[in-house]
Amino acid sequence: MNNTEYYDRLGVSKDASQDDIKKAYRKMSKKYHPDINKEAGAEQKYKDVQEAYETLSDSQKRAAYDQYGAAGAQGGFGGGAGGFGGFDGGGFGGFEDIFSSFFGGGGSRNPNAPRQGDDLQYRVNLSFEEAVFGVEKEVSYNREATCGTCLGSGAKPGTAPVTCRKCHGSGVMTIDTQTPLGMMRRQVTCDICHGSGKEIKEPCQTCHGTGHEKQAHKVSVKIPAGVETGQQIRLQGQGEAGFNGGPYGDLFVILNVLPSKQFERNGSTIYYSLDISFTQAALGDTVEIPTVHGDVELAIPAGTQTGKTFRLKGKGAPKLRGGGQGDQHVTVNIVTPTKLNDAQREALQAFAEASGEKMLHPKKKGFFDKVKDALEDI
């Protein structure tokens, strides 16, 4: 069968759209339906139309048919019943992967070549100040290390691995498989040496032939000033042991900066919220402001409003890129008193009158109000 017969059955061209194919199918299906068409051969043509539409209406099967004909579409390259399942989780997995598997495209890698070990991750908590100024920390963790008994060979001391008797050191085996396209050859990992190309007759008693053993490991980490949560530091060669004499993997230290009770931070800028009284805001004052670099004095000008922000230059965190120091932003929050004594209330009333404010004078406190205030102060 040529690669256009299915299209011919539906009466469409090879570049027909899915809508065109669907319309043609409905037309041809109705034309040859056994309940409508009683001519000899109509039933077979109806089945042929169904077969063609089943393939061409599926984009994956259609692609297989266009390239390989009916054998490709019906043979199950898409992982269907009776086909080669598992190439791409059930879908039409791509011919590059399929032919790589059959013709040994992935088997050219030398199984005995040195291979780097796996990378590891380690999370480190930093205080707010440690993140600002930098710190050196020692981290401890377990990792797969080269076996100290066999030095990574996997063989008992005094012995050595030998060439695999099945794959003869290649680490792979060649298998012929019958497919709808004919006989195909593929390479698979050797089931004796598991790809290493070597057999261990007498395994090491410490690592049981793996060449690796779990070991406790410590390493010092220099954390630069100005780091933030989520940033990573890579320590080369501090991961897990390699294979066939390959290098160790790397350790990635992931940083987590703990919150501060006083400050907030975004990049090199530190934020601080300053509570002041309304008299300080109205009359002005000089107050001490905490910073990560020590306390500094800040002049609050008379008439300062809530939300006013002052900048303390150079009192922030270091800039990781470009150098220099960030600033600290101080935002004012004017605190309104919730309780007033008689003298304070009278003073405020006098202030309101002097300001020309029209307001209802609050009712003077009675005996029970004074008792309630006294109990709250206890």
Swiss-Prot record:
CDD domains: DnaJ, DnaJ_C, DnaJ_zf. InterPro entries: DnaJ, DnaJ_C, DnaJ_domain, DnaJ_domain_CS, HSP40/DnaJ_pept-bd, HSP_DnaJ_Cys-rich_dom, HSP_DnaJ_Cys-rich_dom_sf, J_dom_sf. A zinc finger (CR-type) spans 134-216. It is found in: Cytoplasm. Disulfide bonds: none annotated. Keywords: Chaperone, Cytoplasm, DNA replication, Metal-binding, Repeat, Stress response, Zinc, Zinc-finger. Homodimer. This is Chaperone protein DnaJ.
